[in-house]
């Protein structure tokens, strides 16, 4: 029988993110291929652990998995392969604590990080329908004056702290642990005299304008990647630019994933009699909502496939209309009289509280006899 992602990570279904991440790190460390050379079983276990954390470590993917299982993830077009940020963090965790690196982690000769993150503001309309947007970006480029060394005349010295190794070693009992040298940040070299052009930073800042294609259905805090638009970490080589969406709220529609919510205020007589009202759809059409008699306040009605498209699949959510019953703030004499006649016409049915409350009062009186 196939194990669930929770069983693979050895956590309960109600576990929080901190517990899940802690268990993941523990298991990833235990089954890491660098610690289990030639062990195919450990390698497969390591892959399963990464797959499980890729889903449970992301709240949106976790919610899909909890509701629909793996099948739901596949149908929603959820990718389980892009966890580069976490693996880079995990790689440094392995390297600093145990003296070996995670496979696939980026080993950088340059002090310039290849990738960088930039926020992009989108209107509700731009996010829902997608758009082409020109963004102003500023990236780090290798300083030509010092060839990215950060030193005047490219003159670097061996770090005295680590003797040019980039690592220092610590002993605990019978074990020796390697740590990145703090004096040179693992480079093994230090700057004697800073470059005047970049002030020893190894890079200068350059501005550019980029035409970005925003996919239909992108949501707040979603990220998209622009390949080769990141920092120039080596001469002629650039990393990736990650854009994180900041989507403004709409006055009428509220969004949760691919579902849209809208409140429809209806008068109390409409609820009593039943009625058909027009509801605006996302694409400008009018949808007919048949309100049944005696519908309840906050009762919701769903229009399937009238929501937002998933940015990575053909799936489209629902438009959910929530009724908001409105009562008159005041009545004139004629309205008061009409309501009183209507109320009286129901007879005993118009006073349902009596059967409940009078029985309760009678019971309480019996208690004190």
From Swiss-Prot:
<keyword id="KW-0677">Repeat</keyword>
<dbReference type="Pfam" id="PF00684">
    <property type="entry name" value="DnaJ_CXXCXGXG"/>
</dbReference>
<keyword id="KW-0863">Zinc-finger</keyword>
<dbReference type="GO" id="GO:0005524">
    <property type="term" value="F:ATP binding"/>
</dbReference>
<feature type="repeat" description="CXXCXGXG motif">
    <location>
        <begin position="195"/>
        <end position="202"/>
    </location>
</feature>
<dbReference type="GO" id="GO:0051085">
    <property type="term" value="P:chaperone cofactor-dependent protein refolding"/>
</dbReference>
<dbReference type="InterPro" id="IPR036869">
    <property type="entry name" value="J_dom_sf"/>
</dbReference>
<dbReference type="GO" id="GO:0008270">
    <property type="term" value="F:zinc ion binding"/>
</dbReference>
<dbReference type="GO" id="GO:0006260">
    <property type="term" value="P:DNA replication"/>
</dbReference>
<comment type="similarity">
    <text>Belongs to the DnaJ family.</text>
</comment>
<dbReference type="GO" id="GO:0051082">
    <property type="term" value="F:unfolded protein binding"/>
</dbReference>
<feature type="binding site">
    <location>
        <position position="162"/>
    </location>
    <ligand>
        <name>Zn(2+) 2</name>
    </ligand>
</feature>
<dbReference type="Pfam" id="PF00226">
    <property type="entry name" value="DnaJ"/>
</dbReference>
<keyword id="KW-0479">Metal-binding</keyword>
<dbReference type="InterPro" id="IPR001623">
    <property type="entry name" value="DnaJ_domain"/>
</dbReference>
<dbReference type="GO" id="GO:0031072">
    <property type="term" value="F:heat shock protein binding"/>
</dbReference>
<feature type="zinc finger region" description="CR-type">
    <location>
        <begin position="130"/>
        <end position="207"/>
    </location>
</feature>
<feature type="binding site">
    <location>
        <position position="159"/>
    </location>
    <ligand>
        <name>Zn(2+) 2</name>
    </ligand>
</feature>
<feature type="binding site">
    <location>
        <position position="195"/>
    </location>
    <ligand>
        <name>Zn(2+) 1</name>
    </ligand>
</feature>
<feature type="repeat" description="CXXCXGXG motif">
    <location>
        <begin position="181"/>
        <end position="188"/>
    </location>
</feature>
<feature type="binding site">
    <location>
        <position position="143"/>
    </location>
    <ligand>
        <name>Zn(2+) 1</name>
    </ligand>
</feature>
<dbReference type="GO" id="GO:0005737">
    <property type="term" value="C:cytoplasm"/>
</dbReference>
<feature type="binding site">
    <location>
        <position position="184"/>
    </location>
    <ligand>
        <name>Zn(2+) 2</name>
    </ligand>
</feature>
<feature type="binding site">
    <location>
        <position position="146"/>
    </location>
    <ligand>
        <name>Zn(2+) 1</name>
    </ligand>
</feature>
<dbReference type="InterPro" id="IPR036410">
    <property type="entry name" value="HSP_DnaJ_Cys-rich_dom_sf"/>
</dbReference>
<dbReference type="InterPro" id="IPR001305">
    <property type="entry name" value="HSP_DnaJ_Cys-rich_dom"/>
</dbReference>
<feature type="repeat" description="CXXCXGXG motif">
    <location>
        <begin position="159"/>
        <end position="166"/>
    </location>
</feature>
<feature type="domain" description="J">
    <location>
        <begin position="4"/>
        <end position="69"/>
    </location>
</feature>
<dbReference type="Pfam" id="PF01556">
    <property type="entry name" value="DnaJ_C"/>
</dbReference>
<keyword id="KW-0346">Stress response</keyword>
<feature type="binding site">
    <location>
        <position position="198"/>
    </location>
    <ligand>
        <name>Zn(2+) 1</name>
    </ligand>
</feature>
<protein>
    <recommendedName>
        <fullName>Chaperone protein DnaJ</fullName>
    </recommendedName>
</protein>
<keyword id="KW-0963">Cytoplasm</keyword>
<dbReference type="GO" id="GO:0009408">
    <property type="term" value="P:response to heat"/>
</dbReference>
<comment type="subunit">
    <text>Homodimer.</text>
</comment>
<keyword id="KW-0235">DNA replication</keyword>
<dbReference type="GO" id="GO:0042026">
    <property type="term" value="P:protein refolding"/>
</dbReference>
<keyword id="KW-0862">Zinc</keyword>
<dbReference type="InterPro" id="IPR002939">
    <property type="entry name" value="DnaJ_C"/>
</dbReference>
<feature type="repeat" description="CXXCXGXG motif">
    <location>
        <begin position="143"/>
        <end position="150"/>
    </location>
</feature>
<dbReference type="InterPro" id="IPR012724">
    <property type="entry name" value="DnaJ"/>
</dbReference>
<feature type="binding site">
    <location>
        <position position="181"/>
    </location>
    <ligand>
        <name>Zn(2+) 2</name>
    </ligand>
</feature>
